[in-house]
Amino acid sequence: MADINSPLEIGVTTGPIRGSKKIYVGARTGSGVRVAMREIQLEGGEEPVRVYDTSGPYTDPEVSIDIQAGLPALRREWIMGRGDVEEYAARAVKPEDNGQLGPDRSGGVPAFPNVARTVLRAKPGQNVSQMHYARKGIITPEMEYVAERENVGRAKLETAPDGQAWGAEIPQEITPEFVRDEVARGRAIIPNNINHPETEPMAIGRNFLVKINANIGNSAVASDVAAEVDKMVWSIRWGADTVMDLSTGRNIHDTREWIIRNSPVPIGTVPIYQALEKVGGIAEDLTWDIFRDTLIEQAEQGVDYFTIHAGVRLPYVPMTAKRVTGIVSRGGSIMAKWCLAHHKESFLYERFDEITEIMKAYDIAYSLGDGLRPGSIADANDEAQFAELYTLGELTKRAWEQDVQVMIEGPGHVPMHKIKENMDKQLEACGEAPFYTLGPLVTDIAPGYDHITSGIGAAQIGWYGTAMLCYVTPKEHLGLPDRDDVKVGVVTYKLAAHAADLAKGHPAAKVRDDALSKARFEFRWRDQFNLSLDPDTAEQYHDQTLPAEGAKTAHFCSMCGPKFCSMKITQEVRDFAAKQNSDSYLASENIKRETSAEEAEEAREGMSDMAELYKAKGERLYLPESEAD
């Protein structure tokens, strides 16, 4: 049994991602804002490739990482400089905050040692949301940071974007003014609680790069704060743009504090989970006062967005009765049970405007939960799902009336032919507020492979306009993901998000693809590894069959071998054509001098002779060495 006052040993992965270095780019506005990026170093005189980076200070060897102290408060001066916040004494931590209904805190985890004694909130009559600033015409440092971050790679563009954007309005260049306008219109959010100054600002919206979220958190059967902090750092190393702490069971408050203080990305939660723990897991005992207290507790800690299942209304619950899988959302089922037990409208719906007042005092974004999402393809696009969606649209407009940022959560389990309807209806119902979907899974027959079944749907709905994709790991429906599962889920969803960016014609999306393709053709193996989403696995697979160091410079791989490598043969064809300097049109590069008539005729005769030889040898593409002369 852990001693609540004992030190906590937490080890996280630090150091540069292989083949890369952390760089900081100054905003072009000259404001002094410095934006973190990753630069992949290439061989053969090739210019390095810059990529969007979510890993925070953990990949900067110049930064000393101390998990006990937390990360530097990057945004503190920006927040205080606006003059619209006040400091006050933080709410005292109660035993029930950690799922302990009595005074005994044994079995808990050590409290974070560097907890702030005072926290921030808006001054009376003030609104500190990024949407409020945007609507007042103010470009904040957060907006400048986002603009510079989203422009990565665009300076090297040589070709026009190629894709189908489905109505998205993606500019050739992202400016701070464009970011401000998107936030003001509600088409994008910058989730940044004023009590989470450690965050590096990012935007979620369909006119920006598609983002991904990773879920972590303990459960009633597995609770280890060290493992959860490690999973957070591990997930952002591989590309998670936000992280949701879905902890249930005990130690929720303390686990969340460790995570937030060490997270450079926005942290989301589902507050109803913790509220339920405070009443011993009995949904009927939930009250507005307990829920409100939980919101303030988490707001003071610095949670950046809340999933609120306010669209699960009493009249909609009977609509799920004939479903194959009923209500599969934990938050949705909690509120449905409460509504039926009391036969009353949900207090989340009835008190929505009061929740919004709390959100704007801390700049917390709504993630309006899809508590009635389909849990099987049989239930996709049904009456209950879309009834809730249109209610979420109504609530979005109410939140916008108070300048509070909103994104909308979506399914779920949806077969491919029904996915676009989800996107179209969400845009219509919710006024283009960012869509945030869990997959969707396109089939239900692959437990153990649901990162793939959902990745297919995620790429598709991301192309249609979803702004953020919530990852699914191989453990979905089976168990709690471990560190390896987290990596697989993140990399799978980075792939889906990138595929969506390519399909939308997002400027600069192809830069990394083209660099890797060129490295592949030129047999620059290390560059291929380093440009990939997972360099370690790429090299590991290569070395399973060709482990020798010399294989890293070989002009073939184990798939085809030296004699059958199509790219090596193509290079030889190019070299031959260029050497012959003929008009055979085989050379893909421009010939630097004119071909004489005599040379052209000689080349034609030579090719005619070789064509006859090819026929004489049985029209075989490859010959044994004994017959090659």
Curated annotation (Swiss-Prot):
Pathway(s) of this molecule: Cofactor biosynthesis; thiamine diphosphate biosynthesis
Catalytic EC class: lyase
Cofactor remark: Binds 1 [4Fe-4S] cluster per subunit. The cluster is coordinated with 3 cysteines and an exchangeable S-adenosyl-L-methionine.
UniProt: substrate binding residues: N215, M244, Y273, H309, S329, R330, G331, D370, G371, L372, R373, E409, Y436
Binding residue positions for [4Fe-4S] cluster: C557, C560, C565
Zinc among keywords: yes
Enzyme Commission designation: 4.1.99.17
GO cellular component terms given for this protein: cytosol
Gene3D superfamilies: 6.10.250.620, Radical SAM ThiC family, central domain
Residue positions binding Zn(2+): H413, H477
Catalytically driven reaction(s): 5-amino-1-(5-phospho-beta-D-ribosyl)imidazole + S-adenosyl-L-methionine = 4-amino-2-methyl-5-(phosphooxymethyl)pyrimidine + CO + 5'-deoxyadenosine + formate + L-methionine + 3 H(+)
InterPro entries found in the cross-reference section: ThiC, ThiC-associated_dom, ThiC/Bza_core_dom, ThiC/BzaA/B
Keyword annotations of the record: 4Fe-4S, Iron, Iron-sulfur, Lyase, Metal-binding, S-adenosyl-L-methionine, Thiamine biosynthesis, Zinc
Keyword Nucleotide-binding: no
A molecular function GO annotation: 4 iron, 4 sulfur cluster binding
Region (Disordered): 589-610
Complex formation: Homodimer.
PANTHER family, A to Z: PHOSPHOMETHYLPYRIMIDINE SYNTHASE, CHLOROPLASTIC, THIAMINE BIOSYNTHESIS PROTEIN THIC
Function: Catalyzes the synthesis of the hydroxymethylpyrimidine phosphate (HMP-P) moiety of thiamine from aminoimidazole ribotide (AIR) in a radical S-adenosyl-L-methionine (SAM)-dependent reaction.
Name of the featured protein: Phosphomethylpyrimidine synthase
